[in-house]
UniProtKB/Swiss-Prot annotation:
Disulfide linkage: none
Name of the protein in its database record: ATP-dependent helicase/nuclease subunit A
Gene Ontology, cellular component aspect: cytosol; DNA helicase complex
Pfam families: UvrD-helicase (PF00580), UvrD_C (PF13361)
Biological role stated in the UniProt entry: The heterodimer acts both as an ATP-dependent DNA helicase and as an ATP-dependent, dual-direction single-stranded exonuclease. Recognizes the chi site generating a DNA molecule suitable for the initiation of homologous recombination. The AddA nuclease domain is required for chi fragment generation; this subunit has the helicase and 3' -> 5' nuclease activities.
Coiled coil: none
Sequence positions that bind ATP: A28, S29, A30, G31, S32, G33, K34, T35
Subunit structure: Heterodimer of AddA and AddB/RexB.
EC number(s) from the headed UniProt entry: 3.1.-.-, 5.6.2.4
NCBIfam families: addA_Gpos
């Protein structure tokens, strides 16, 4: 049978299509044609005699799986039409008929199929419903957690007549005076982390071991030696490097030599500490670090300009050393050993209790899901792995024999659990795993993706086919963008990305190579632009972040207006000619959805059509905030902020002066009582025209509120919400606002969420409001995208949502966004590899004390977080840089 050879493929692409018989890792830069290569490899396998239903093709999203299936079908049709041999044509048509049932899917879909086919291996009920709605899962989990939490508060998990005092201490440690949401947060997050591991129970039970106190002392413990000591030694090494530079500077002038003795003393002390680090006890660490601290700054004579420059540099080095030594003392050795050991023990007991609570909740949640015949996505992977891991598993043997090759797309975004599942279904003799990805584009760390899996194979795999166990193939050509885009992307990466920061060195193998040679050379290349927004002092506002957000949106809007007014020309690849730019050619990309509301507002003012491709910040939209405030008021009107929000909204329509009049009439009561008093004491002769307007609006609103509260007590929430839409005309009102269709879709989404809430057996407005608040806290959007795909409008989306897309003009906004370290400000810190670190609350002294695991994990996570945020920015440039084919303003 004919073998597929594409003259347009590069040698590397053709190698990725042809080579087999061993594991292959394809490092494919964005725009390098990896999807075409994957499809061609599948077709090549078919032409060589492999049936398409003996391939497992794993993609990261359902959309990618659908696209892959469609492209394979199209390629088979094309090959069938071109085939001249009847036998070949018949075989290709046969394979085309097998594609709909072939295993081309996400890993979750594959896991689902494994469970449905081999449920009996683990004695599982084959009848279940997939809990695919995140909000529905959260709702069920919340309900189970409330039961478990109350049982702990009622001492139901201890022997009769015993008090579960440790649970109260646990709740107090992670909560505040208002509620115990902090405990809820850590239990839910612990469960998510545990479920991302191949053995959740084992992972949880390991957490308290970090708090064990060795009989030989704190510094003799494995945790101190493995986790704390490297941090201390790294800091001391940095101090020694700074001291070495200071020593060299002191030798540049006789006047600076007065620093030499001090430098030498501290150098010797720190060198000795590093040499003895593994054997030093707690007190020795405290004492020797204190002794190593630099003394007061030295006074020098009047210096020459060059001497002053060197002195300033020298002093900066010494100040840095002082600060680092003092930070070590204040962070790790602030207490003596006995006090620190006691904190470790007390915190360890709380962590042990926390693990027990989490396991109890996990068991109860699993039992409730089984009772309701439900599975969530984490269950799919866990149960699939269990089925494949059973000794002499028929499922593992079946799939290893069935699949002639396993192809994994976006391999850089897999996690260890998914990697374990993939390895279970691949063959050992010969190896048959084909992986495609790009570590520079791994932007799913928040989903516990582990790019180090890709990196390790990248470093370990052989670079030639002769090394038969494994092979690494690099696809570096970018077939999307013009040369100026490639050059700028490479410039950024070469400055910022290396082995320490970005999992690999940005060398010639990683750099983008120009491959889009279809662009005509005679047409001018548009430069990459950097748009700077500078606020004049007299124009500055009280909120700098608000000022920055508005400023950059306005700057982009003006730049787009100029491009459209000037009729800027772009190259159309389909038409193969230059044409005037259209709105649909432009996309705005941002790391988050934070500026979407500004964009909608300001682009409307500038007359620019815009479509939000990603769900916007749903709970921040005006219409949703008003509805949530109204629901809160219906549930409990004695809440000033929600009540004033509703009164100020279009539903009632009071302005600032009218609201002030109500408050002036009653300065002491809550606002709801003030409204009552205003109506009760109303005197048409005294209040004037303004008061008459207020009275009219309040009377109408109070009648509505009374009606709504009656409905809330007697009817389902969905009836209440729909009645609000009808009686107030609010749904129609928002339809006339900018982006009206999207706003109406948002209100419909709230109605649909209430429907799902009650269909799952949950009741009550108060509980529904709590559920929505929980969604808000976890940033779970409910917005329904408006179908405007064919509209000539500017697209707005996140970097995540843009992968694989292509636009002639891309505006990358919010590039000055600071690193997000919010996770490090809580009373606990979690890391899949480092475990759990908690801040211990001494209830008697009302003192919060970081534990050693908290300090170690925070230090490592802060470094990792900064690296991840930097990498995310770099990867944004890579993703953006390879979806632009004409102009790229930032």
């Amino acid at each position: 049978m004919a073998i597929l050879s594409n003259p347009q493929f590069t040698p590397s692409q053709q190698a990725a299509v042809d080579h087999d018989g061993h594991d292959i890792l394809v490092s494919a830069s964005a725009g390098s044609g990896k999807t075409s290569v994957l499809v061609a490899r599948v077709i090549q396998k078919i032409l060589k005699g492999t049936d398409v239903d003996t391939l497992l093709v794993v993609t990261f999203t359902e959309a990618a799986a659908t696209e892959m299936r469609q492209r394979i079908q199209a390629a088979l049709r094309d090959a069938s039409e071109k085939a001249t041999e009847p036998a070949v044509k018949q075989r290709l048509r046969q394979q085309l008929s097998l594609v709909p049932t072939a295993q081309i899917s996400t890993l979750h879909a594959f896991c689902l199929k494994v469970i449905k086919q081999f449920y009996y291996v683990i004695d599982r009920d084959p009848v279940f419903r997939l809990l695919s709605d995140t909000a529905e899962r959260l709702l069920l989990a919340d309900q189970v957690w409330q039961r478990v939490r109350e049982a702990f508060y009622n001492h139901e998990y201890v022997k009769e007549n015993e008090q579960d005092t440790l649970f109260y201490e646990l709740a107090q440690n992670f909560s505040n005076d208002r509620n115990d949401d902090g405990l809820t947060d850590i239990v839910f997050e612990l469960l998510d982390f545990a479920n991302a591991n191949s053995n959740p129970v084992k992972w949880l039970n390991k957490l308290p071991k970090s708090y064990a106190v060795d009989e030989a002392g704190l510094t003799a413990s494995d945790y101190f030696q493995e986790k704390i000591l490297p941090i201390l030694q790294q800091t001391i090494t940095e101090c020694l490097e700074a001291l070495q530079e200071a020593e060299q500077l002191s030798k540049t002038s006789e006047n600076l030599m007065i620093y030499a003795p001090q430098i030498a003393t501290t150098q010797a002390a720190l060198t000795q500490i590093n040499a003895d680090a593994k054997t030093l006890n707690w007190q020795a660490w405290r004492q020797q670090l204190t002794d190593a601290q630099l003394g007061p700054a030295k006074r020098t004579k009047k210096l020459e300009p060059d001497e002053q420059i060197n002195k300033d540099r020298l002093k900066a080095d010494l100040d840095d050393v002082k600060k680092k030594i003092q930070t070590l003392l204040d962070t790790y050795f602030v207490f003596d050993e006995a006090t620190t050991a006691n904190i470790q023990r007390q915190a360890g007991q709380l962590v042990q209790k926390l693990v027990s609570v989490t396991l109890t909740f996990r068991e109860a949640f699993q039992a409730e899901k089984e009772r309701r015949h439900l599975l969530d996505f984490s269950d799919l992977e866990q149960l699939c792995l269990t089925i494949l891991s059973v000794e002499d598993s028929p499922a593992r043997a079946f799939y290893q024999q069935k699949f002639s090759e396993v192809l994994v797309d976006e391999y850089q975004d897999t996690n260890p659990l998914q990697e374990t599942i993939i390895q279970k279904v691949t063959s050992d003799h010969p190896r048959n795993l084909f992986m495609v990805g790009d570590v520079k584009q791994s932007i799913y760390a928040f989903r516990l993706a582990d790019p180090s899996l890709f990196k390790n194979k990248y470093n370990e795999f052989g670079v030639t086919e002769a090394e038969r166990d494994s092979e690494r193939i690099i696809l570096a050509e970018n077939f999307r963008s013009r040369r100026n885009i490639d050059d700028f992307t490479n410039l950024i990466f070469k400055q910022l990305m290396d082995e320490n920061l970005g999992e690999l060195d940005y060398d010639e193998n990683a750099a983008l190579q120009y491959g889009a040679r279809y662009y005509p050379d005679q047409h001018p290349t548009a430069p990459t632009e950097l748009l700077l927004y500078e606020t004049k002092p007299e124009e500055a506002v009280a909120n700098p972040q608000l000022d920055k957000s508005e400023g950059q949106v306005v700057a982009v809007a003006k730049r787009i207006q100029a491009m459209m007014t000037n009729g800027e020309q772009i190259w159309d690849k389909k038409l193969e000619k230059m044409r005037p730019i259209e709105y649909r050619d432009i996309v705005l990309l941002a790391p988050t959805r934070g500026n979407n509301l500004f964009i909608l507002d300001y682009f409307k003012r500038f007359g620019l059509p815009v479509v939000i491709k990603d769900a916007q910040n749903y709970f921040q939209t005006t219409e949703v905030q008003i509805m949530l405030a109204l629901l809160q008021v219906i549930d409990n009107p004695n809440q000033d902020i929600p009540l004033v929000s509703v009164l100020r909204s279009p539903i009632v329509g009071l302005n600032e002066n009218e609201l002030a009049l109500i408050r002036i009439n009653d300065k002491t009561d809550d606002y709801y009582q003030a409204v009552f008093n205003f109506i009760d004491q109303y005197n048409e002769q005294k209040v004037g025209h303004l008061g008459q307007q207020v009275m009219q609006k309040l009377t109408h609103f109070m009648a509505l509120l009374t009606s709504f509260r009656t409905i809330a007590r007697q009817q389902p929430i969905v009836d209440l919400i729909w009645t609000i839409y009808q009686e107030t005309g609010f749904l129609d009102y928002v339809g006339g606002m900018p982006a009206g269709r999207q706003r109406q879709a948002n209100l419909h989404a709230l109605y649909e969420r209430a429907t799902a809430y009650e269909e799952n057996g949950f009741k009550g407005l108060f509980q529904f409001i709590q559920f929505i608040e929980r969604l808000q806290k976890q940033d779970k959007d409910l917005a329904q995208p408006t179908s405007l795909e064919n509209q000539d409008a500017i697209s707005v989306m996140t970097i995540h949502g843009s992968k694989g897309l292509e636009f002639p003009v891309v505006f990358l906004i919010d590039t000055s966004r600071r690193f997000n370290q919010q996770d490090l400000q809580r009373s606990y810190v979690l890391d899949n590899h480092g475990g759990l670190g908690v801040v211990y609350l001494d209830s008697q002294k009302r003192l919060k004390v970081p534990t050693l695991p908290e300090l170690a994990i925070t230090a490592q996570k802060r470094k990792k977080l900064r690296a991840e945020e930097m990498l995310k920015t770099i990867r944004c440039f890579d993703t953006c840089g390879t979806m632009v084919n004409h102009r790229w303003p930032l």
